């Protein structure tokens, strides 16, 4: 009896997973994440240099980050742009240096373009969550400005704290089983999970359950890490871009990787947004089915009520009836 129950539970679990996958595929088609990822790729490439310039300007305002600026840049480029991080870092640093020499109007334009990227992310994720109410202009602007100012500080602080903890002699001496190297290796994955979780919890203009956002963040982070390894392997194993584009091979590589990255980000968002829809529908269906099982047979089946006239007219005739 116990084995039968266990088998039925396993079957129902996998059936539920399969139904959710079908619902997810339908949701992906409706949301057109490939089109949204293309739009975000265009905006990202347009605002990449302004965003980096604003980020570095914010970090430069804090003396504590001066000594680890190179460490932060290396960590970001190595973990965000596989196989071409050094080249992209060289070009972007040169562009940022040129942009920092501009006038106040030019710097203001950089800030506006950087805000365009945050606004595009906000609109795409709220469209995936089917958010009907838009944020007020001042609320949205305050949120975008907070991301521009506090985002780099939090990122720099987290990397600085991690570097400090890793360099502690106490940890290195107490690390008998090699836990510290393992944690260092998993740091990019943990940062990705935290970043996606914050994105899925904060950006949609509605309440998102923590577990739903965490599941989407975990899937997106795992896909992001797998995508980095796979993309780096493809670029290094099949260097067709370098044979075609030569020294400009970094440009299409960056285009493709940014597009894949946004596809993964939006895919995780669709998972987090579709999960409560599916669970609500599934619970409703289960309740209806349970209600039909608990109800008496006469109430469970819908049949038209008999009226007295029709019942009397259909009575069988007896011998005493006339005619």
From Swiss-Prot:
Coiled-coil stretches: none
Region described as Disordered: spans on this chain: 285-323
Residue intervals passing through the bilayer: 5-25, 45-65, 102-122, 137-157, 179-199, 207-227, 251-271
Pfam families: Virul_fac_BrkB (PF03631)
Keyword Transmembrane helix found: yes
Biased composition (Low complexity): 302-315
Name listed for the protein in its UniProt record: UPF0761 membrane protein Sama_3404
Native source organism of the sequence: Shewanella amazonensis (strain ATCC BAA-1098 / SB2B)
């Amino acid at each position: 009896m116990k084995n039968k129950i266990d088998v039925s539970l396993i079957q129902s679990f996998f059936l539920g997973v399969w139904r959710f996958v079908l619902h997810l595929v339908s949701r992906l088609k409706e949301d057109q994440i490939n089109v949204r990822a293309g739009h975000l790729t265009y905006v990202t490439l347009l605002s990449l240099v302004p965003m980096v310039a604003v980020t570095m300007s914010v970090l430069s305002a804090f003396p504590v980050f001066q000594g680890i600026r190179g460490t932060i840049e290396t960590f970001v480029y190595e973990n965000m742009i596989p196989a071409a991080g050094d080249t992209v870092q060289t070009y972007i640093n040169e562009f940022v240096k040129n942009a920092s020499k501009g006038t106040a109007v030019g710097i203001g334009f950089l800030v506006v373009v950087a805000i365009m990227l945050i606004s595009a992310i906000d609109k795409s994720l709220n469209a995936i969550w089917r958010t009907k109410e838009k944020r007020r202009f001042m609320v949205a602007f305050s949120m975008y400005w907070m991301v521009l100012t506090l985002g780099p500080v939090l990122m720099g602080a987290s990397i600085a704290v991690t570097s400090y903890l890793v360099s502690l002699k106490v940890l290195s001496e107490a690390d008998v089983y090699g836990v510290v190297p393992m944690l260092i290796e998993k740091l990019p994955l943990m940062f990705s999970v935290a970043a996606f979780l914050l994105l899925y919890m904060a950006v949609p203009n509605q309440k998102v359950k923590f577990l739903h956002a965490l599941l989407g963040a975990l899937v997106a982070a795992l896909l992001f890490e797998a995508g980095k390894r796979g993309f780096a392997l493809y670029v290094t194993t099949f260097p067709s871009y370098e044979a075609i584009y030569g020294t400009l091979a970094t440009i299409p590589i960056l285009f493709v990787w940014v597009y894949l990255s946004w596809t993964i980000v939006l895919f995780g968002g669709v998972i987090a947004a579709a999960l409560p829809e599916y669970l609500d529908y599934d619970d409703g269906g289960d309740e209806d089915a349970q209600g039909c099982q608990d109800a008496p047979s006469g109430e469970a089946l819908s049949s038209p009520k008999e009226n007295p006239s029709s019942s009397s007219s259909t009575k069988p005739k007896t011998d005493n009836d006339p005619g």
